[in-house]
């Protein structure tokens, strides 16, 4: 390269002349007059520079150069002097954008753009004002201005709204076909409002969705499958459609919440303790929508608060059902047949009942919840029926060239897992084909409305059905109930629904029911309008007489007039009682939470109380026996198991009846009163208190006063406590017999003592008068029966206190007691108490009468029989007391006078109280004060002067098996002083 650059320039023959070079360069130029000459001279005078990457500086034909470098040099030389068009386009676009801003658009240009937010405002305003373009434009502008005042939204005018209205309708009107009798504004409103609702629910609209727009317009509701979810779309109950249907506008100012807060609290102490025993909060709060069924609400809480026995029963039933042989299912050749039914798990718990809170105001609902939230009453079919059109839009055939989803082939069973729930249902809701006659149109429409109704429709079926029952009762000429009610202002729908749904047994048997229930049952069997439950099969007669169909409008108008004349502002007492009684799973029917909220709810809250109903003992026993026999595993087939269960039930019938009678007797013997009603002389008063569920407080007070002033025969020296202890013994004995009958049969001859269950009051016997309206944290007062035992005076035999054996004191607690009627209790002592019983007979024979000796011999015979049960005896007999004391003393020093001197008179406080002269005055003044202070103050009046040093007077009157240690210390001190003196 250096050698070539240092060579002298080539000869002039090879070097091109400057003019030719300048001419060759200036050939592509458009003009070479002035500027071209200058350019030529400048190019010729400029020294040639070496270009980077070039091989030679001159265009020598003999020198070979790279094609890439030459091409690059040519590109540099032929570079255009003007900028490319891509660099000039942005300036033009910016100029155009600057000229046309949304605020400077002309109204008549026809190129108005609508954003998504503006479209949403358009459809909202359309639902409110209908085909009033000026009002719609004002509503859109107000919403856009409220949304953001500084935004660049173009405020719409009346003409722009009209243009968008007709453009949108023109795009979607091809999917819906209307009757010729239907006016054009009604067609436009029904199409646009339903399209706006579908657009609001679905994010993207496809051709498949537009195919269902017709069904939404005709029937008022559809279900669309989108992104794996079933989305339910209903025709909105807006003001525009209500005004078009000429419906009552009284519901426009009423705003119900979409969800309400339900507060549940226990109705009594039994329900409170039942839930608290499960370690759960008895007070609950749940937020549910208005269309929530009451029966599912009850089932939720029943499952949540089921008892431990029910849980164990369910686990046991599941275990036994899984262990049953499945041979019967293998014998079925048909795959479509269902498997053999497993043993159903019977509920051991009583049914749960929900009732309104006491004191809440129950008023007649001023609106029909069905008319408020229902979309069927304002659909196109209902509008055409209300207007009396002869040809319905729904009966018209599909347009030519349109693909209809109903005419498509159903999917096969191979993809059954991927099928949507909509395809699994029968396709009876599709529009009829072209060859369907027009006369069958109304019948087909009714069928479609019935099968498309769902359980989530806020009980619209039952309320429309019950609302039309009143019309049928007032106007017997109307043979059938219309499919849709025109008088939506019926204020008795919810009340009648609550009333008639309480007694399903009477509805099933009209012979035992009143006229209204009989009419409800008869109309239910022949009705074609609405089914009370979504699972009701549509197999009844759907044909309605044409005469009744023609008179439907007149009957409704007459019913509305009669209702206006017979308007009752308040509910009857019978309906109030039924509502106050509450609802269980059996009589909840199709009532929803919205129905209850309309009747006695307020401020988006609904207060309910719950309790468990009492179950008949015979019914519960029979169900438990059948359940046990059914669940018992066996190797036979299902039919054999059923037969064995029936035979076992027949065999155990007698034993179950006996057990039921015993349990009923025990339940009647135990009452919910904190005292023994047997102590009262007035039988009528006791019967009134024990039989009434919520008794009067005055009866309780009178009964307490009667107990303190009663006069009856004394059976023993400790007369005021024996009867109550005998009642406790009777309850404990019956409980022990029931426990032993249940499963302690093999331990009759054993020497082990069976631990007994503590004697408790059953939960059902808690005083129902006490409610939980004002619960505080103070302790609940309990009526405790204290067993008091009096020690003998020391003057009898000059016997010290320490000789009294504690073992012998407690041994008397397990001795049988002597009953008033001559029979003894079933409590049997152990083998260790046999010497005490024999000594008891020996010592008691010295000073007892022959009658008492016979009773003691009978007790000794009973004591020799050893049993597996050992009843805790709460009573202490006279003979037992004598035996306990005499067994610890020297037998040589025992005589009759010493034994009799122990209990010369009863030293109980009540005995001293009755013997005093001021007994009547103290009872009158302190009838409600049974405190220890008042009792001791009364005793001080009897004997105010007592010597403290006297050992006999130092013993406490109400000492509880205790030892006077102060007197003992005095004796020890005196003994030590005597020893020091000696």
UniProtKB/Swiss-Prot annotation:
Biological processes, Gene Ontology terms: pattern specification process; regulation of DNA-templated transcription; segment specification
Segments of skewed composition (Basic and acidic residues): 86-98, 410-425
One MF term from GO for this chain? chromatin binding
Q: What is the effect of changing residue 823 to I?
A: In strain: Berkeley, k9, wi10 and wi19
Effect after changing residue 493 to T:
In strain: Berkeley, k1, k8, Oregon-R, pe7 and pe10
* Major localisation: nucleus
Q: Identify residues that carry Phosphoserine.
A: 431, 437
Keywords, A to Z, come to: Developmental protein, DNA-binding, Nucleus, Phosphoprotein, Transcription, Transcription regulation
Q: Please give the annotated consequence of changing residue 830 to S.
A: In strain: k1
Chain intervals with Polar residues compositional bias: 100-111
- The biased composition feature labelled Low complexity covers 21-30, 822-833
Ranges for domain SANT come to 109-173
- Tell me which SMART domains the record gives: SANT
| Bias kind Pro residues: ranges | 7-20
> What function does this protein fulfil?
Polycomb group (Pc-G) genes are needed to maintain expression patterns of the homeotic selector genes of the Antennapedia (Antp-C) and Bithorax (Bx-C) complexes, and hence for the maintenance of segmental determination. Can act as a modifier of position effect variegation (PEV).
Q: Which family does it belong to?
A: Belongs to the cramped family.
Task: State the protein's name.
Answer: Protein cramped
């Amino acid at each position: 390269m250096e050698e070539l650059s240092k060579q002298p320039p080539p000869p002039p023959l090879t070097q091109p002349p400057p003019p030719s070079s300048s001419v060759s360069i200036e050939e592509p130029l458009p003009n070479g007059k002035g500027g071209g000459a200058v350019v030529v001279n400048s190019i010729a005078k400029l020294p040639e520079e070496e270009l980077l990457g070039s091989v030679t500086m001159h265009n020598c034909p003999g020198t070979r150069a790279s094609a890439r470098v030459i091409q690059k040099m040519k590109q540099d030389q032929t570079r255009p002097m003007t900028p490319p068009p891509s660099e000039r386009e942005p300036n033009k676009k910016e100029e155009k954008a600057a000229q046309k801003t949304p605020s400077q658009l002309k109204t008549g240009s026809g190129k108005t753009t609508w954003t998504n937010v503006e479209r949403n405002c358009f459809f909202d305003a359309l639902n409110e004002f209908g085909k009033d373009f000026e009002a719609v434009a004002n509503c859109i502008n107000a919403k856009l201005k409220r949304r953001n005042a500084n935004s660049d939204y173009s405020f719409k005018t009346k003409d722009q709204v009209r243009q968008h209205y007709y453009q949108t309708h023109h795009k979607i009107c091809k999917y819906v076909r209307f009757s010729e009798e239907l006016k054009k504004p009604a067609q436009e409103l029904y199409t646009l409002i339903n399209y706006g609702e579908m657009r609001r629910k679905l994010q993207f609209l496809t051709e498949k969705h537009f195919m269902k727009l017709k069904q939404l317009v005709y029937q008022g509701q559809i279900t669309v499958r989108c992104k794996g979810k079933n989305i339910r779309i209903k025709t909105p109950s807006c003001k525009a459609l209500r005004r078009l249907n000429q419906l009552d506008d009284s519901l426009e100012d009423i705003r119900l919440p979409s969800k309400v807060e339900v507060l549940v609290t226990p109705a009594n102490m039994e329900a409170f303790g039942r839930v608290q025993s499960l370690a759960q909060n008895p007070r609950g709060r749940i937020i549910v929508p208005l269309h929530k069924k009451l029966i599912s609400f009850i089932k939720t809480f029943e499952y949540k608060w089921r008892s431990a026995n029910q849980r164990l029963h369910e686990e046991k039933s599941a275990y036994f059902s899984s262990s049953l042989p499945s041979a019967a299912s293998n014998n079925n050749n048909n795959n479509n047949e269902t498997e053999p039914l497993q043993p159903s798990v019977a509920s051991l718990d009583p049914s749960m009942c929900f009732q309104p809170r006491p004191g809440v105001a129950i008023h007649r609902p001023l609106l029909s919840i069905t008319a408020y939230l229902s979309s069927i009453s304002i659909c196109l079919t209902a509008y055409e029926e209300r207007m009396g059109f002869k040809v319905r839009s729904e009966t018209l055939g599909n347009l030519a060239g349109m693909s209809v989803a109903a005419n498509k082939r159903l999917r096969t069973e191979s993809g059954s897992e991927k099928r949507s729930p909509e395809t699994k249902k029968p396709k009876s809701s599709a529009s009829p084909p072209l060859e369907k006659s027009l006369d069958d149109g109304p019948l087909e429409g009714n069928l479609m409305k019935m099968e498309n109704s769902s359980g989530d429709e806020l009980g619209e079926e039952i309320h429309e059905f019950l609302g039309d029952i009143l019309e049928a009762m007032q106007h017997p000429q109307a043979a059938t109930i219309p499919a849709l009610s025109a008088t939506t202002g019926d204020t008795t729908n919810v009340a009648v629904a609550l009333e008639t749904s309480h007694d399903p047994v009477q509805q099933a048997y009209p012979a035992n029911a009143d006229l209204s229930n009989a009419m409800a049952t008869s109309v239910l069997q022949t009705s074609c309008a609405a089914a009370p439950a979504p699972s009701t099969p549509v197999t009844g007669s759907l044909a309605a007489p044409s005469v009744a169909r023609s008179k439907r409008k007149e009957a409704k108008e007459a019913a509305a007039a009669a209702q206006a004349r017979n308007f009752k502002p308040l509910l009857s007492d019978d309906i109030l009682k039924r509502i106050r009684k509450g609802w269980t799973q059996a009589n909840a029917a199709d009532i929803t939470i919205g129905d209850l909220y309309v009747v006695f709810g307020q401020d988006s809250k609904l207060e309910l109380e719950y309790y468990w109903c009492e179950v008949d003992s015979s019914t519960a026993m029979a169900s438990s026996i059948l359940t046990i026999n059914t669940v018992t595993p066996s190797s036979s087939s299902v039919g054999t198991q059923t037969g064995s269960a029936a035979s076992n039930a027949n065999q155990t019938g007698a034993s179950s009846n006996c057990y039921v009678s015993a349990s009923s007797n025990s339940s009647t013997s135990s009452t919910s009163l904190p005292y023994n009603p047997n102590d009262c002389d007035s039988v009528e008063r006791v019967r009134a208190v024990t039989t009434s569920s919520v008794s009067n407080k005055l009866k309780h007070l009178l009964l307490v006063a009667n107990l303190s002033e009663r006069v009856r025969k004394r059976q023993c020296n400790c007369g005021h406590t024996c009867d109550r202890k005998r009642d406790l013994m009777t309850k404990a004995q019956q409980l022990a017999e029931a426990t032993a009958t249940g499963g302690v049969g093999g331990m009759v001859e054993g020497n082990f003592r069976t631990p007994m269950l503590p004697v408790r009051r059953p939960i059902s016997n808690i005083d129902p008068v006490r409610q939980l309206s004002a619960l505080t944290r103070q302790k609940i007062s309990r009526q405790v029966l204290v067993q008091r035992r009096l020690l003998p005076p020391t003057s009898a035999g000059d016997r010290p206190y320490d000789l009294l054996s504690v073992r012998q004191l407690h041994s008397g607690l397990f001795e049988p007691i002597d009953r008033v009627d001559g029979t003894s209790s079933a409590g049997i002592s152990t083998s260790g108490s046999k010497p005490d019983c024999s000594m008891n007979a020996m010592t008691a024979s010295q000073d007892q009468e022959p009658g008492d000796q016979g009773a003691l011999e009978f007790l000794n015979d009973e004591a020799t029989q050893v049993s597996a049960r050992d009843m805790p005896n709460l009573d202490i007999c006279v003979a037992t007391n004598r035996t306990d004391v005499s067994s610890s003393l020297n037998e040589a020093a025992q005589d009759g006078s010493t034994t009799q001197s122990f209990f010369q008179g009863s030293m109980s406080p009540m005995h001293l109280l009755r013997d005093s002269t001021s007994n009547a005055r103290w009872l009158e003044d302190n009838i409600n004060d049974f405190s220890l202070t008042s009792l001791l103050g009364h005793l001080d009046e009897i004997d105010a002067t007592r010597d403290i040093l006297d050992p006999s007077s130092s013993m406490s009157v109400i000492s509880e098996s205790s030892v006077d240690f102060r007197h003992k210390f005095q004796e020890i001190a005196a003994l030590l002083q005597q020893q020091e003196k000696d």
